[in-house]
Amino acid sequence: MAPPNTIDAGLTQRHITTTAAPTSAKPAFERNYQLPEFTIKEIRECIPAHCFERSGLRGLCHVAIDLTWASLLFLAATQIDKFENPLIRYLAWPAYWIMQGIVCTGIWVLAHECGHQSFSTSKTLNNTVGWILHSMLLVPYHSWRISHSKHHKATGHMTKDQVFVPKTRSQVGLPPKESAAAAVQEEDMSVHLDEEAPIVTLFWMVIQFLFGWPAYLIMNASGQDYGRWTSHFHTYSPIFEPRNFFDIIISDLGVLAALGALIYASMQLSLLTVTKYYIIPYLFVNFWLVLITFLQHTDPKLPHYREGAWNFQRGALCTVDRSFGKFLDHMFHGIVHTHVAHHLFSQMPFYHAEEATYHLKKLLGEYYVYDPSPIVVAVWRSFRECRFVEDHGDVVFFKK
């Protein structure tokens, strides 16, 4: 799907700018970029030991709270059509869709915690809770757990990362950088993007944010190019190994059970009823998931690495922390504003990640990336400016 952005700091962090650099010269942040040389040992040692402690009881309490909110919202929604005033109904349904989408995104995050085994010390509990919660949201739990683990193990790697893999110069149809025609065509491309009608950009943003998540699961959209059809539902997909066969079957059965329940409800009630109570909130979950992950891994100042320069900690730092506001940060269980810590130590439970981030900032300095830009500004900038990377080079940055 997308690429990285700009970052300027205070004393300890870079910070996003909105000034576009000429296509003929490298931006200052790219010219001055130096590879981080931290070891994973020194990064881990800067974080208090208790931040790595997991509590199944605490995890289950968060699940209970989120499921309670989802149930209360559902029950409240059953009263909406009883209002005689149509204006109240027209206002109440969107309010339900938005709030239920937010709550269910939080539930999705808790299932994601289970997949990382950060939910509790019990693998059985983690996988049981994760399978139930993700199946409810039409996510093949083990299938995505496996591909997501590979993403964490190879974040920022041009040929091994699993999602948000940037297209190269040749893949977008530009001539080699060294050719005389390249500068002219690149300039033409830049002008074309600048002049592209905002409504066109907005249209493609809506398509990506609403349908990008199921497209990734079904056909590996924005994922690594394996040269053949790839899907999270296919047991022999190149994402998986033969030993994953039964995990994929179990994942598919969970999604099929959820789809069966939705089809049954549609037959007993109506498709319109299922659409109002489930499908529209589900689309809002898709929106939040793609928005969150797009912004975490897409920014002009974040590098991508090839084999010669990549290592785990460098790749883990190729992500951006940002805030969606205290309410959403809380409802999304810190996945937005503590993502750097999560990528460095994915088995750290989310409720300790904020404290860990505090210590990481002090150690990482300018290599800790936080973007305070308004979300709308950040999305627009990344969507229009992060188009491709060069075909060659161990360290590459997004180009417009």
From Swiss-Prot:
Its main location: membrane. It is a multi-pass membrane protein. Pathway: Lipid metabolism; polyunsaturated fatty acid biosynthesis. GO terms for molecular function: acyl-CoA (9+3)-desaturase activity. The keyword Lipoprotein does not apply. Pfam families: FA_desaturase. The chain crosses the membrane at residues 91-111, 199-219, 245-265, 277-297. One of its GO terms (cellular component) is membrane. Keywords: Fatty acid biosynthesis, Fatty acid metabolism, Lipid biosynthesis, Lipid metabolism, Membrane, Oxidoreductase, Repeat, Transmembrane, Transmembrane helix. GO terms for biological process: unsaturated fatty acid biosynthetic process. It is found in: Membrane. Catalyzes the desaturation of oleic acid (Delta(9)-18:1) to linoleic acid (Delta(9), Delta(12)-18:2). The histidine box domains may contain the active site and/or be involved in metal ion binding. Belongs to the fatty acid desaturase type 1 family. This is Delta(12) fatty acid desaturase. It comes from Mortierella isabellina.
